[in-house]
Regions:
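Alpha-helical scaffold elements lining the catalytic groove of polysaccharide deacetylases
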Residues: 145, 192-222, 237-283
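Hydrophobic alpha-helical membrane-insertion segments, chiefly the h-region
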Residues: 12-25
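Short glycine- and acidic-rich boundary segments immediately preceding or forming the N-terminal edge
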Residues: 62-63, 69, 74-111
Length: 357
């Protein structure tokens, strides 16, 4: 018995020594190191390749989500939607709503070269499946309305994309931060919602670029961290000469599949009816609404309930890479003297309150 034990111990020792030699050889192998450098170089080359993307390249499903609400500790799928150098969205708190709409899946958008989405204007990338909906909101953040929209989304354990006006974001940075903290995707919608297809912007591309870039910078600064290279033109007016510019900036352009025209509606029930009627006809779609509109904020709980009842599933769009702002336009935003440089922006109720009435 002792002989067997001694032999076994000797064999184990020899095995460990052999394993150590193999590891040491690999660690010192210059061929392996060179292969690693080559791999990194190829990756950088791929990033710089601005050739048009195929659907599978521009849009990629992240680790699939179930249609049930996302729990607090379910961070694997959320983190997989971003590369290591981009921040993963904050997951929801544990969902206590058994009837919540939840998320079906998360879609990663590779914005290299400025791909365009939304079949109302662009037909190349139609990535949604039947009964899938991507919720998008324009013109915020706005007090009262944006918090109503956010609460409804959180109550239903789901997410959306917000295209914010830069000037609005500088007025209410705390609202932009709340959206980001809740894991919403935040893109931009110009600095002051100017129609870039009209003069003076139609005649002066530099003014148009400034309107776009100041919006990008302002939203980024209001959030206080990375935002998405997602952009939507005001009034869905997309001047052709600006499309290549956004391509050089690797900013994706979003039109819509379904415009609810909620800005023309004053009753929440009409907003719900518009969205559901058009979805029933289209079967799926990127849904355009406005968190600037009070009726839309009021409509959200019922709209999300009807989406769940109708068998629709929510898809959340996230970027592969975060936006990069340009210093020139960062300074322009700061020069407006409207931007709060505080990292701890306080809510209005904490600054001003009625003590006698």
């Amino acid at each position: 018995m002792r002989i067997v034990v001694v032999v076994f111990a000797a064999l184990m020792t020899l095995g460990l020594v052999a394993f150590g030699l193999v590891v040491a050889q690999k660690a010192s192998d210059p061929t392996a190191a060179a292969a690693g450098v080559s791999s990194l170089q190829n990756t950088e080359s791929a990033k710089n390749d601005k050739a048009p993307l195929h659907l599978g390249e521009a849009v990629k499903a992240a680790a699939p989500f179930t249609s049930t609400p996302v729990a607090q500790n379910d961070t694997t799928a959320v983190a997989a939607a971003f590369p290591a150098h981009a921040p993963a969205p904050t997951p929801f708190a544990a969902c206590n709503n058994p009837d919540a709409l939840g998320l079906s899946r998360v879609i990663e958008i590779d914005t290299a070269g400025g791909p365009a989405f939304g079949t109302e204007h662009f037909k190349q990338y139609d990535f949604l499946r039947d009964k899938e909906v991507a919720l998008t909101f324009d013109d915020g953040p706005w007090p009262g309305n944006t918090p109503m929209v956010l609460k409804a989304l959180q109550d239903n354990c789901t997410k959306a994309t917000f295209f914010e006006i830069g000037e609005h974001a500088t007025w209410r940075p705390e609202l932009a931060k709340q959206l980001a903290a809740a894991g919403m995707t935040i893109g931009s919608h110009t600095w002051s919602h100017k129609d870039l297809a009209k003069n003076p912007y139609a005649k002066d591309i530099e003014q148009a670029k400034q309107e776009i870039e100041m919006g990008v910078s302002a939203v980024y600064m209001a959030v206080g961290g990375p935002t998405a290279p997602f952009f939507r033109f005001p009034d869905l007016q997309q001047p052709r000469d600006l499309m290549p510019y956004l391509g050089t900036r690797n900013i994706a352009i979003f039109s819509t599949d379904i415009d609810t025209f909620d800005f023309k509606l004053r009753r929440p029930e009409d907003v719900v009816k518009s969205a559901m009627t058009k979805l029933a006809k289209n079967g799926k779609g990127i849904l355009l609404m406005h968190d600037f509109q009070h009726a839309t904020g009021e409509a959200m709980p019922e709209l999300l309930r009807q989406l769940k009842a109708g068998g629709y599933k929510i898809v959340h769009m996230v970027p592969k890479e975060p936006i990069t702002t340009l210093a020139k336009y960062d300074e322009m935003v700061r020069a407006r003297d409207k931007y709060s440089t505080s990292n701890n922006a306080r809510s209005e109720s904490s600054v001003v309150k009625t003590i006698s009435e």
